[in-house]
Amino acid sequence: MNQIILWGILVIPWFLLLLLDKQRVKRFFTVGLFAALMMTIAYQVAEKMHWWTVQENVFFLTSMGATIYCLHIVITIFVFYLTYPGFILYIIVNIILDLIHGYVIVPFLAKIGLYNLYDINHFGLFLVMTTIAIILYLFQRLLDFIFEESPA
């Protein structure tokens, strides 16, 4: 059953992007990929600091959660699609999603044996995720600045 959940996390969210305007998805796809990079770094730090571990995964991933390569990218695109450029709305939506992630989703994943927190608590995880969200917003602003200044 866990493998079905993991494969669903890895594949299904990509189809949700088909519901959105293609041009706007393209605009935010880079920040989505940057989110995957940031989460990959976070998972590497977490492994070294013993903050959390991935207990079970799809066969080709080791310590990286399946959520990095799909769910985080798609959710990042969705959040930017719906809230950008308004920082206040963006941060409010991210705080709500990060609280749900830290206090609802992670305990569920731990309960079914996919994920465990060790030397970081739920609030610490929330802070990590919110910090990444702020970095992502700044990255998107930088992209906008670069592409607005570029000659067409």
Describe each region flagged by the PLM.
Residues 1-152:
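Aromatic-rich, lipid-facing transmembrane alpha helices and their immediate juxtamembrane interface loops
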